[in-house]
Amino acid sequence: MSSNRVLDLFKPFESFLPEVIAPERKVPYNQKLIWTGVSLLIFLILGQIPLYGIVSSETSDPLYWLRAMLASNRGTLLELGVSPIITSSMIFQFLQGTQLLQIRPESKQDRELFQIAQKVCAIILILGQALVVVMTGNYGAPSDLGLPICLLLIFQLMFASLIVMLLDELLSKGYGLGSGISLFTATNIAEQIFWRAFAPTTVNSGRGKEFEGAVIAFFHLLAVRKDKKRALVEAFYRTNLPNMFQVLMTVAIFLFVLYLQGFRYELPIRSTKVRGQIGIYPIKLFYTSNTPIMLQSALTSNIFLISQILFQKYPTNPLIRLIGVWGIRPGTQGPQMALSGLAYYIQPLMSLSEALLDPIKTIVYITFVLGSCAVFSKTWIEISGTSPRDIAKQFKDQGMVINGKRETSIYRELKKIIPTAAAFGGATIGALSVGSDLLGTLGSGASILMATTTIYGYYEAAAKEGGFTKNLVPGFSDLM
């Protein structure tokens, strides 16, 4: 069966799949802002509504470290977050990248069928993940819940995930300023970072009652402690709670990523239609934006989820233990973590000391993150319409050629630059993620990068639509 025939199998689903109709004309900037704001508000509301019928949600959480990246809130309608949608995209990226599924980019029908296939896969994954979450006892033993409550929980999870999928489609089809998935994820990350920095709640520690938020704790410690030097040290380096060092590292990483956004390779181009008209085509360092780290997180989350579920069911099976052994790390009261196996080696490094104490894990983890981000970035360009062939076609349609090169050599020249730039940019974003984890930030390195690149991308889109300056950080673009 040919790959085109495989795509044709999804054509019958077109008539009854939920779909957002693309706008007939360009949506005005002000309306895009409204649609983006309303979509974000709906998403935030879904993340605050608890699931009806839960007996308990105090079981181990295999996705604890990745919930921010997946825009997931435990025990709410957004339990699944954007994981099924990203996973579906990752699966079809793999199928296309390995030539198991081929589409003709110039064919509108192929592109539409490809999107339908992705949507069908996402719905199947939504159902599958909802079944797994409910039937593995995350909200109480299924026998205690009963069949009606189990079905109700599955329905709630599916309904909310379908709403998220349609909101993403709404924004991506031109009603909003960009990708809904990126926006939802960045908002969830920013919300968690803000809470860790400014949370007014208090917790009981060995040092007495302390404010959870790092900034509030900083001022509180300076106000109540007589020994100001000791208060400063405690505020900057306290353990098991957010501290000011993490706040400063988060701000530093944010600004550094903004700085790197200005790095690009400028390809000189000229017009074949207007004599003397020249310009540049910029190829950015982050050519595929935050897509590599998003897909890498989706891959990791699925491995973690499957590993922990299998370990709970078959804890003594040697093959299952090879995939991952889960438990609470000795000397901590935190969530369950991978203690050995494959899951342990791809689990994020929590600190520089952990990296030094286990160099084998450090090498494996860094290789995995950099390699997977580079591969995802390089293959993503074939799907997203930014491959050398796609850009060469744009040049031809617009009557542009590379300065000093013949028109027939455009594709060959772009093929030398774009795949390398995409892979290098993906590896760079992976390296920044690992570095952020080692330095210590309010959240994982991947989540900080995801939020920063999304915020910058949305700012650029708003600047383009609204016609104002793109210089987000004064002076940064001048250094390029």
Curated annotation (Swiss-Prot):
Highest taxon of source: Eukaryota
Name of the protein described by the UniProt record: Protein transport protein SEC61
Membrane-spanning ranges: 33-55, 76-95, 120-141, 147-167, 213-224, 241-260, 291-311, 362-381, 417-434, 438-459
Topology within the bilayer: Multi-pass membrane protein
UniProt record similarity statement: Belongs to the SecY/SEC61-alpha family.
GO BP field: ERAD pathway; misfolded protein transport; post-translational protein targeting to membrane, translocation; retrograde protein transport, ER to cytosol; SRP-dependent cotranslational protein targeting to membrane, translocation
Keywords: Endoplasmic reticulum, Membrane, Protein transport, Translocation, Transmembrane, Transmembrane helix, Transport
Ranges per topology, Cytoplasmic: 1-32, 96-119, 168-212, 261-290, 382-416, 460-480
Outcome recorded upon mutating residue 275 to E/F/V: Severe growth defect; lowers SRP-dependent and SRP-independent translocation
Mutation effect (residue 273 to P/G): Severe growth defect
Location(s) in or outside the cell: Endoplasmic reticulum membrane
Keyword Transmembrane helix found: yes
Any one Gene Ontology cellular component term annotated for this protein: Sec61 translocon complex
Positions in the Lumenal compartment: 56-75, 142-146, 225-240, 312-361, 435-437
Assembly behavior: Component of the heterotrimeric Sec61 complex, which is composed of SEC61, SBH1 and SSS1. Presumably three to four Sec61 heterotrimers assemble into an oligomeric ring with a central aqueous pore. In cotranslational ER import, the pore diameter varies from 9-15 A in a ribosome-free resting state to 40-60 A in a functional state when associated with the ribosome. The Sec61 complex is part of a channel-forming translocon complex whose composition seem to change dependent upon different functional states.
Task performed by this protein: Part of the Sec61 complex, which is the major component of a channel-forming translocon complex that mediates protein translocation across the endoplasmic reticulum (ER). The functional states of the translocon complex include co- and post-translational ER import, cotranslational membrane protein integration and retrograde transport of misfolded proteins out of the ER. In the cotranslational pathway, ribosomes synthesizing presecretory proteins are targeted to the translocon by the cytosolic signal recognition particle (SRP) and its ER-localized receptor.
InterPro entries membership: SecY/SEC61-alpha, SecY_CS, SecY_dom_sf, Translocon_Sec61/SecY_plug_dom
Taxonomic placement: Eukaryota, Fungi, Dikarya, Ascomycota, Saccharomycotina
